[in-house]
Amino acid sequence: MKKRNRLKKNEDFQKVFKHGTSVANRQFVLYTLDQPENDELRVGLSVSKKIGNAVMRNRIKRLIRQAFLEEKERLKEKDYIIIARKPASQLTYEETKKSLQHLFRKSSLYKKSSSK
C-alpha cells in the first residue's frame, strides 16, 4: 500500500475516532471519516495485542490490507480505520474479504456505479 494511502499518526486516528462514524460485525470494526481536502482514501489498521502473537497479528493485517486493496477502486475517498476483533484470527482470506465487503455495504461506502 502506498504511503499516501496510509493513516499512521495518532492525531489522524483520534480525529477519525472522534468525528467519524462506525459500523461493526463480529470480526471487524470500521471507522470512516469524510475528508474533503484529501482526494485519495487512506486506511489505518489496528490489531490488539490480545489477539495471538506478533505473527498472527501481522497475518491479520496482511489479509486486511490485501482485501482492502482489491476493493479500493470501488470505495469512496475517505479515511478508514479497521480494527480487528478476536474472531478475525480464525478467518481465511476469502472470509476476511467477505466480512469487509459486508461492512462497506452496511455503511454505503461503495461509489455509485457509472453504468446506470
Swiss-Prot record:
Its EC number is 3.1.26.5. GO terms for molecular function: 3'-tRNA processing endoribonuclease activity; anion binding; chloride ion binding; DNA binding; molecular adaptor activity; phosphate ion binding; ribonuclease P activity; ribonuclease P RNA binding. It comes from the Bacteria. Keywords: Endonuclease, Hydrolase, Nuclease, RNA-binding, tRNA processing. Consists of a catalytic RNA component (M1 or rnpB) and a protein subunit. Might be a component of the prossible RNA degradosome complex composed of rny, rnjA, rnjB, pnp, pfkA and eno, and possibly also rnpA. Interacts with RNA helicase CshA. RNaseP catalyzes the removal of the 5'-leader sequence from pre-tRNA to produce the mature 5'-terminus. It can also cleave other RNA substrates such as 4.5S RNA. The protein component plays an auxiliary but essential role in vivo by binding to the 5'-leader sequence and broadening the substrate specificity of the ribozyme. This is Ribonuclease P protein component.
